[in-house]
C-alpha cells in the first residue's frame, strides 16, 4: 500500500503549475498513477531464472499478478477512506472490468491462466466503493533511478555486467547487483540469440498492467550471417508482440559492436576488490549513489 499512498499524496501538494486549466482538471479528477518495476533482471537472476526460461515467465506472471492485485486493493481501500476519484465513473473499473478481463488470450499459451488471488471479491469491492485512482500501473525506463538504487534498468536485461552511464558530472560505472554470486544467472542483452524470451516476459506483465508497456527489441548482428539482421526476423518479432498483446514498442536496439572504451574485467576486479562479497551490494563503489 505504501507506493500508492505515497504517490497519492503528491496530488495534495502543488509542486508545479499547470499550463492550462483542462490539464489541472483532468489530473486532479483522475488522480492517475503509474507505478512499475525496477530491477526485474536482478529479481530473475536471484531466482536462478533467465528471460528465455519458461519458469521465468511463470515467475513474472505470479509477481505481476500480486503487484496489480495489491495496487488495486490499496486504491480501493483509499477510496473507502477518502473517497473515489471524481472521474472514476469514466473508467472501465467502474463497470467491473479489470485487466484480467481484457488481455489477449494468446498469453495463456505462455503461462496458463491460473490466478492466485481473489479477484472476484476485489471486483465487487471496486464496483461498490470505487478506486482512489483511475489508473495505477505503468512501466518506466528508470535509467536514472536505477543508478541511485543500484538496480538494473526497469524490466530490461543489462547490456553487460559493467556499464558506463553518462551524467552531468561525467561517466559513471555501474556493475550489476550481486555480481560475484549471480553473474552466471544474469541474462545479458547482447548475448540473447533472439527476443522470444524477453517478448514473453513483457507479455505476461501486460496481462495485468492497466496502462501500456513500451517494450524494446534488441539485435546483435554477430548472431546473424554476414552481421546483418534479416528483415524477416524483425517482422516476426513485430507480429509476435502483437499476437501476445503488446500495446506499444519503444526502441529497436542494435549492438554497434563498439565498447565503452573500458576494460570490463579489469574494472570489475578493481571495483570488487574494494569490498567483500558480503558487502558487495552495500559497497559505495557499487551503489553509485551520486549526489
Regions found by a protein language model. Give the residues of each.
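Catalytic phosphate/nucleotide-handling subdomain of diverse soluble enzymes
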Residues: 47, 57-59, 63-71, 150-166
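Catalytic alpha/beta core of large soluble enzyme barrels
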Residues: 12-15, 111-116, 125-132, 137-274
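Internal maturation/activation junctions in enzymes
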Residues: 8-24, 28, 50-142, 214
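Single conserved hydrophobic/aromatic residue that forms the stacking wall/gate
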Residues: 1-7, 11, 289-290
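Cysteine-cluster motifs in flexible loop/terminal segments that predominantly coordinate metals
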Residues: 277-288
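Generic structural signal for well-ordered, non-membrane alpha-helical segments
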Residues: 5, 11, 33-37, 57-72, ...
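Contiguous, well-ordered alpha-helical segments that form the cores/surfaces of helical PPI scaffolds
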Residues: 31-46, 62, 144-147
Amino acid at each position: 500500500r505504501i507506493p500508492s499512498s505515497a504517490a497519492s499524496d503528491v496530488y495534495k501538494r502543488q509542486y508545479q503549475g499547470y499550463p492550462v486549466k483542462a490539464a489541472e482538471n483532468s489530473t486532479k479528477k483522475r488522480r492517475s498513477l503509474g507505478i512499475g518495476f525496477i530491477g526485474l533482471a536482478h529479481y530473475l537472476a536471484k531466482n536462478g531464472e533467465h528471460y528465455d526460461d519458461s519458469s521465468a515467465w511463470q515467475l513474472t506472471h505470479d509477481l505481476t499478478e500480486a503487484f496489480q492485485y495489491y495496487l488495486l486493493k490499496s486504491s480501493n481501500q483509499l477510496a473507502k477512506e477518502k473517497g473515489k476519484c471524481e472521474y472514476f465513473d469514466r473508467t472501465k473499473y467502474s463497470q467491473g472490468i479489470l485487466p484480467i478481463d481484457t488481455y489477449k488470450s494468446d498469453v495463456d499459451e505462455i503461462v496458463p491462466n491460473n490466478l492466485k488471488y481473489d479477484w472476484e471479491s476485489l471486483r465487487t469491492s471496486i464496483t461498490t466503493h470505487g478506486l482512489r485512482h483511475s489508473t495505477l500501473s505503468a512501466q518506466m525506463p528508470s535509467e536514472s533511478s536505477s543508478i541511485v538504487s543500484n538496480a538494473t534498468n526497469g524490466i530490461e536485461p543489462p547490456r553487460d555486467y559493467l556499464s558506463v552511464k553518462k551524467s552531468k558530472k561525467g561517466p559513471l560505472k555501474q556493475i550489476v547487483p550481486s555480481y560475484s554470486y549471480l553473474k552466471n544467472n544474469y541474462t545479458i542483452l547482447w548475448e540473447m540469440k533472439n527476443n522470444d524470451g524477453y517478448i514473453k516476459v513483457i507479455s505476461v506483465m501486460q496481462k495485468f498492467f492497466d496502462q501500456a508497456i513500451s517494450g524494446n527489441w534488441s539485435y546483435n548482428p554477430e548472431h546473424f550471417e554476414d552481421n546483418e539482421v534479416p528483415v524477416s526476423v524483425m517482422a516476426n518479432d513485430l507480429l509476435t508482440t502483437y499476437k501476445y498483446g503488446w500495446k506499444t514498442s519503444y526502441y529497436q536496439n542494435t549492438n554497434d559492436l563498439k565498447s565503452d572504451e573500458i576494460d570490463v574485467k579489469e574494472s570489475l576486479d578493481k571495483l570488487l576488490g574494494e569490498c567483500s562479497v558480503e558487502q558487495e551490494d552495500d559497497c559505495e563503489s557499487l551503489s553509485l549513489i551520486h549526489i
